[in-house]
């Protein structure tokens, strides 16, 4: 009897254990590497893989699914493909690629996956976001109406940029495209120091396919000017694989979207999208996608449009934040009719066209006003700027035309000669040294002098215009700082009178030596 009771007790214990047993089967979506060549792994299996999904190889290297067939998947390897071997197991993560976002990334240099590349230690970001996200819809947007000041005279006055705009910087190599972008970032330092948190402009600089030495110079320049404290640098250098170069601008855009979606303002530089397109072309050809014009795949337009459409000025309900994009595109011998330049021109809200001929003539920044345009920026210009800049573009265009005409050596009447002389002074006033941005109030003073006080200006020899400009601005700051502050919004008749008296007195005592 005793033994039988023991048996029944044992049976009940076993039954209880079986009924309460809870060890669910863990299902994983796995596959096997068939081949790997030039950073592309062909994987058998992965039946439930999604396009754009992140996967892990046996060695720990990450990859992204960019091609789906009946029983195979084409995966781009985010790292060294030597670590991936035939027969390796591949696991799906169930997630797309994410990057850390937030204020913790300011002042840091990261790669396309958000991993630190500087000596600042681990990034402890509270938030992470998908690098691919849908652009804001029509209802969520607002028209561009706030100025984004670059500190560059010829741009702020003649090709104004607004917060939320997409303005292309295009031109041949080594003629100042990156310099314009850097100067715009540096100029935000002065503005950020004077405004509250919600009006500050945070910056993201994305370096795509550049030499590491070039990126190091950019980072050092930002450090020297104090601009790195509000800037994040995303780097996919020339030594990185094509998939990393392809992901970099999307990662940078996601970092900028954090500020946009939280009611703040952000400026993002893509330097440059030509190399980005080349990286995508390389990936597409290796994935055996059919090539189109210039061997680019058919969806190269969508690759750039879905990136640039994420730049926007948000509506009041969405927090009034903004993301301003300055993409850079490199041309070959000034050919803007190539495939990628024409694509990006059609996507953006205007372009700043740099010309090598102007650059070698000494007119820097070498902006060709005739080919440059800002389609929405004028709505964001200050009233004081509109009043002085209205006739400047026309004067410069007339001067360029008359300059060509005067080369024939024919006799010129007095009015034509006057226009030529005025044009020479205007060209000198619009020249600007790199990394020395100028406030909008200082620009207004100089252009008002040209437009309304040319008789005073013409007393200065043209070779001394740069010295005159430098000394005059210093004179305003030290002796008449109140006048500059009044110019931050509008220009009244009283201010015009003050400027006339100040300039007249200054010209008489200006020392050319």
From Swiss-Prot:
GO CC, alphabetical: plasma membrane; proton-transporting ATP synthase complex
Record keywords, A-Z: ATP synthesis, ATP-binding, Cell inner membrane, Cell membrane, CF(1), Hydrogen ion transport, Ion transport, Membrane, Nucleotide-binding, Translocase, Transport
Reaction(s) this enzyme catalyzes, per UniProt: ATP + H2O + 4 H(+)(in) = ADP + phosphate + 5 H(+)(out)
InterPro entries: ATP_synth_asu-like_sf, ATP_synth_asu_C, ATP_synth_asu_C_sf, ATP_synth_F1_a_nt-bd_dom, ATP_synth_F1_asu, ATPase_a/bsu_AS, ATPase_F1/V1/A1_a/bsu_N, ATPase_F1/V1/A1_a/bsu_N_sf
Pfam families linked: ATP-synt_ab, ATP-synt_ab_C, ATP-synt_ab_N
Primary localization class, coarse: membrane
Membrane topology designation: Peripheral membrane protein
Subcellular locations according to the entry: Cell inner membrane
Residues the record lists as binding ATP: 171-178
Enzyme Commission number: 7.1.2.2
Site for Required for activity, residues: 372
The organism's place on the tree of life at top rank: Bacteria
GO molecular function terms listed in the Swiss-Prot or TrEMBL record: ADP binding; ATP binding; proton-transporting ATP synthase activity, rotational mechanism
Assembly mode: F-type ATPases have 2 components, CF(1) - the catalytic core - and CF(0) - the membrane proton channel. CF(1) has five subunits: alpha(3), beta(3), gamma(1), delta(1), epsilon(1). CF(0) has three main subunits: a(1), b(2) and c(9-12). The alpha and beta chains form an alternating ring which encloses part of the gamma chain. CF(1) is attached to CF(0) by a central stalk formed by the gamma and epsilon chains, while a peripheral stalk is formed by the delta and b chains.
Biological function: Produces ATP from ADP in the presence of a proton gradient across the membrane. The alpha chain is a regulatory subunit.
UniProt record similarity statement: Belongs to the ATPase alpha/beta chains family.
The protein's name in its UniProt record: ATP synthase subunit alpha
Biological source species: Wolbachia sp. subsp. Drosophila simulans (strain wRi)
Upper classification of the organism: Bacteria, Pseudomonadati, Pseudomonadota, Alphaproteobacteria, Rickettsiales
């Amino acid at each position: 009897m005793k033994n039988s009771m023991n048996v029944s007790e044992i049976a009940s214990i076993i039954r209880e254990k079986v009924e309460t047993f809870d060890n669910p089967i863990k299902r994983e979506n796995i596959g096997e590497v068939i081949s790997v060549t030039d950073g592309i792994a062909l994987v058998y299996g992965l039946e439930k893989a999604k396009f754009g999904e992140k996967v892990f190889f046996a060695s720990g290297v990450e990859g992204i699914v960019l091609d789906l067939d009946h029983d195979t998947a084409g995966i781009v390897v985010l790292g060294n493909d030597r670590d991936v071997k035939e027969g390796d197991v591949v696991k799906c993560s169930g997630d797309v690629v994410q990057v850390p976002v937030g204020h913790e990334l300011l002042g840091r240099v990261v790669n396309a996956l958000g991993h630190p590349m500087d000596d600042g230690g681990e990034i402890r970001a509270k938030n992470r976001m998908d690098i691919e996200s849908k652009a804001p819809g029509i209802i969520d947007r607002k028209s561009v109406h706030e100025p984004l000041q670059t500190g560059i005279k010829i741009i702020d006055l003649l090709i104004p940029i607004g917060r939320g705009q997409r303005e292309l910087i295009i031109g041949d190599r080594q003629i100042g495209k990156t310099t314009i972008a850097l100067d715009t970032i540096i100029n935000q330092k002065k503005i950020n120091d004077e405004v509250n948190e919600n009006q500050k402009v945070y910056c993201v600089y994305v370096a795509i396919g550049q030499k590491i030495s070039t990126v190091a110079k950019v980072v050092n320049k930002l450090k020297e000017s104090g601009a790195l404290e509000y800037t994040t640098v995303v780097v996919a250098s020339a030594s990185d694989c094509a998939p990393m170069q392809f992901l970099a601008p999307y990662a940078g855009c996601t970092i900028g979207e954090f500020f946009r979606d939280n009611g703040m303002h952000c400026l993002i530089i893509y330097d440059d999208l030509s190399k980005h397109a080349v990286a995508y072309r390389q990936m597409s050809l290796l994935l055996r996608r059919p090539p189109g014009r210039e061997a680019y795949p058919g969806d190269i337009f969508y690759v750039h449009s879905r990136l640039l459409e994420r730049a926007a000025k948000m509506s009041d309900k969405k927090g009034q934040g903004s993301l301003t994009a300055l993409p850079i595109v490199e041309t070959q011998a000034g050919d803007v009719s190539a495939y990628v330049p024409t694509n990006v021109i059609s996507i953006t809200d205007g372009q700043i066209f740099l010309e090598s001929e102007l650059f070698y003539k000494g007119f820097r920044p070498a902006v060709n006003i005739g080919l440059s345009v800002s389609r929405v920026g004028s709505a964001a210009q200050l009233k004081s700027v509109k009043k002085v800049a209205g006739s400047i573009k026309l004067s410069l265009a007339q001067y360029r035309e008359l300059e060509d005409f005067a080369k024939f050596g024919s006799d010129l009447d007095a009015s034509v000669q006057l226009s030529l002389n005025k044009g020479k002074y205007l060209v000198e006033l619009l020249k600007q040294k790199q990394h020395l941005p100028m406030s909008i109030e200082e620009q207004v003073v100089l252009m008002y002098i040209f437009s309304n006080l040319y008789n005073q200006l013409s007393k200065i020899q043209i070779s001394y215009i740069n010295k005159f400009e430098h000394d005059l601005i210093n004179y305003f700051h030290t002796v008449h700082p109140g006048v500059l502050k009044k110019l931050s919004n509008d220009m009244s008749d009283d201010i015009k009178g003050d400027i006339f008296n100040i300039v007249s007195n200054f010209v008489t005592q200006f020392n050319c030596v």
